[in-house]
């Protein structure tokens, strides 16, 4: 019985692994641009091709509608359910949030019910065509890594074109045509991606798969990216070396999956029958609840991350490259022509780094903190020597230990690094983090570790309170001084003045005029336990 269970679990694991492995393999590599390796000559940099992780690119886009006033609700209007032209009690009103359907609802989270969606005005001006262009712009070159998925809240359109731009919207090329009747709408024979091959993968087709009218289970339109990958990598995308080889050597294939903008052209809404019902035009409109576009910044295999700042995407370039797409060599690193990285050989690829110009070795890039540098052939890089102004690093771009970056100063400012000034009595060491905060000892707080936490007082650093006149009282008439010691009357001694001084001399008795020592108080017992764990105090 146990053997059969083991075999069943093993079979399940093998099945899951075989299914998941290709998808982990597809996008799991090229996430490191360089790494230190050990050779006979010592530690050296190993440069590799690298790219950002695939992500949801709708977070970074700008959407534009044409005509601009095509969204419903201004003025308010009623519309009918597609499946029932007599149910016209739905209302779109742009001035009421609960009834408004603005464009941003195409990109929000769709985990709730009812779903949110953008909606156009109805076809009230029939027979004038009801046509809408929805343009998605990134102001940056991106590479598509998964299917484009458009979910309609209304019926899928009878006619639609998905277009792409590679030059920020100046020119457009069709990606795919969609129609209930391709021959009638676009004079094209209907096809599906399954009809293509390696040799025809770039063919622009018209498909009738996604334009079958309204149905609750038929709301989605795809542009199949992964099916096209599969022509080279196999049905489960196992042979990525083949796909990467094609992307490396075939510019047209690489450009096919690359865009700066996408445009959805809605040419005819879902009618549901051959003829338009002119008595119920309020049932004809477009409504989109979700658009999914997954991809990554195109960085020419010279970066692993892409910054989004001031509504703009920019690659964080490595390999001595620069530009929004890492598309050129940095100044003084033009010793050979710029080249994109290469996916091959699998799995690390080739970095094709930019190397220093022969004339640039004497012109160091040290942000003005040094005029000396050295080209290290083994590391294939230039390193600044003798950085000043408390800086360090390959380009004097970092701060020395015990200093932190001045956020208000440029990298070439002499005051770019500020001393941490950690209090030596309250801090563990003299170093601080990037915000100037020091690492404090127990009981100490503050940016420079010069303040005490409650229950502690400053005395050559923060020490636990001995007395506080609240919980820990000095006894027998003693007075608390600065929370760190009790000043006792002449006849008493001890931390809380709890002992008779005569006890130390062994002279307590009736003759001395001093009685037996008082019984310990709860406060004294508490203090004794605290001090027992905190260690000896110095007075």
UniProtKB/Swiss-Prot annotation:
N-glycosylated. Residues 46-296 form the Laminin N-terminal domain. It is found in: Cell membrane. Residues 1-18 form the signal peptide. It is a lipid-anchor; GPI-anchor. The keyword Membrane applies. Residues 273-275 are annotated as: NGL discriminant loop III. CDD domains: EGF_Lam. Expression is restricted primarily to neurons of the CNS, particularly in the dorsal thalamus, olfactory bulb and inferior colliculus. Isoform 1A and isoform 1D are the major products in adult brain. Glycans are attached at residues 133, 320, 406, 433. PROSITE patterns: EGF_1 (PS00022), EGF_3 (PS50026), EGF_LAM_1 (PS01248), EGF_LAM_2 (PS50027), LAMININ_NTER (PS51117). The keyword Kinase does not apply. Residues 297-356, 364-419, 420-469 form the Laminin EGF-like domain. Keywords: Cell membrane, Developmental protein, Differentiation, Disulfide bond, Glycoprotein, GPI-anchor, Laminin EGF-like domain, Lipoprotein, Membrane, Neurogenesis, Repeat, Signal. Disulfide bonds join 33-50, 72-92, 80-88, 182-206, 297-306, 299-315, 317-326, 329-354, 364-373, 366-384, 387-396, 399-417, 420-432, 422-438, 440-449, 452-462, 488-497. A lipid is attached at residue 510 (GPI-anchor amidated serine). It comes from the Eukaryota. One of its GO terms (cellular component) is glutamatergic synapse. InterPro entries: EGF-like_dom, Laminin/Netrin_ECM, Laminin_N, LE_dom, LMN_ATRN_NET-like_EGF. GO terms for biological process: axonogenesis; modulation of chemical synaptic transmission; regulation of neuron migration; regulation of neuron projection arborization; regulation of neuron projection development; synaptic membrane adhesion. Residues 208-214 are annotated as: NGL discriminant loop II. Residues 511-539 form a propeptide. PANTHER family: NETRIN-G1, NETRIN/LAMININ-RELATED. The laminin N-terminal domain mediates 1:1 binding to NGL ligand with sub-micromolar affinity. Three NGL-binding loops mediate discrimination for LRRC4C/NGL1 among other NGLs by binding specifically to its LRR repeats. This specificity drives the sorting of a mixed population of molecules into discrete cell surface subdomains. This is Netrin-G1. The gene is Ntng1.
């Amino acid at each position: 019985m146990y053997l059969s269970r083991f075999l069943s679990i093993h079979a399940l694991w093998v099945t899951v692994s075989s299914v998941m492995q290709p998808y982990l393999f597809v996008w799991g590599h090229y996430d490191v641009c360089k790494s230190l390796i050990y050779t006979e000559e010592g530690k050296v940099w190993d440069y590799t091709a690298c790219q950002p992780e695939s992500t949801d690119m709708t977070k970074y886009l700008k959407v534009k509608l044409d005509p601009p006033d095509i969204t419903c609700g201004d003025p308010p209007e009623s519309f009918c359910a597609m499946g029932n032209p007599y149910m016209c009690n739905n209302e779109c009103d742009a001035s009421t949030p609960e009834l408004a359907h603005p464009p941003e609802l195409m990109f929000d989270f769709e985990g709730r019910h009812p779903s949110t969606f953008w909606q156009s005005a109805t076809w009230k001006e029939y027979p004038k065509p009801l046509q809408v262009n929805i343009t998605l712009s990134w102001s940056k070159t991106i590479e598509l890594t998964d299917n484009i998925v458009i979910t309609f809240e209304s019926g899928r359109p009878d006619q639609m074109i998905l277009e792409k731009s590679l030059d920020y919207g100046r020119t457009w090329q069709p990606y795919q045509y969609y129609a209930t009747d391709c021959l009638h709408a676009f004079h094209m024979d209907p096809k599906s991606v399954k009809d293509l091959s390696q040799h025809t993968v770039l063919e622009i087709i018209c498909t009738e798969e996604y334009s079958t009218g309204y149905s609750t289970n038929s709301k989605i339109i795809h542009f199949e990216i992964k099916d096209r990958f599969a022509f080279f990598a196999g049905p489960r995308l196992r042979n990525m070396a083949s796909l990467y080889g094609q992307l490396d050597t075939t510019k047209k294939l690489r450009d096919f999956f690359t865009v700066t903008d996408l445009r959805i052209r809605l040419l005819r809404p879902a009618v549901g029958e051959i003829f338009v019902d002119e008595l119920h035009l309020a049932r004809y409109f477009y409504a989109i609840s979700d658009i999914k576009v997954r991809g990554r910044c195109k960085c020419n295999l010279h970066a692993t991350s892409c910054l989004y700042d001031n509504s703009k995407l920019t690659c964080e370039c490595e390999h001595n490259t620069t530009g929004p797409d890492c598309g050129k060599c940095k100044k003084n690193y033009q010793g050979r022509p710029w080249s994109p990285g290469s996916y091959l050989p699998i799995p690390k690829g080739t970095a094709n780094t930019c190397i220093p110009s022969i004339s640039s070795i004497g012109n160091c890039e040290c942000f003005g903190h040094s005029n000396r540098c050295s080209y290290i052939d083994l590391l294939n890089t230039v390193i600044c020597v003798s950085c000043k102004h408390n800086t360090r690093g390959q380009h004097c771009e970092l701060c020395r230990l015990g200093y932190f970056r001045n956020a208000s100063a440029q990298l070439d400012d002499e005051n770019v690094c500020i001393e941490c000034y950690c209090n030596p009595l309250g801090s563990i060491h003299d170093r601080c983090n990037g915000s100037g905060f020091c690492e404090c000892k127990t009981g100490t707080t503050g940016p420079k570790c010069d303040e005490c936490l409650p229950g502690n007082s400053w005395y050559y650093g923060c020490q636990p309170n001995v007395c506080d006149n609240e919980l820990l009282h000095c006894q027998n008439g003693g007075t608390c001084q600065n929370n760190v010691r009790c000043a006792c009357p002449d006849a008493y001694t001890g931390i809380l003045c709890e002992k008779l001084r005569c006890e130390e001399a062994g002279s307590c008795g009736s003759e001395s005029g001093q009685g037996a020592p008082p019984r310990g108080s709860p406060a004294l017992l508490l203090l004794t336990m605290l001090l027992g764990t905190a260690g000896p105090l110095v007075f």
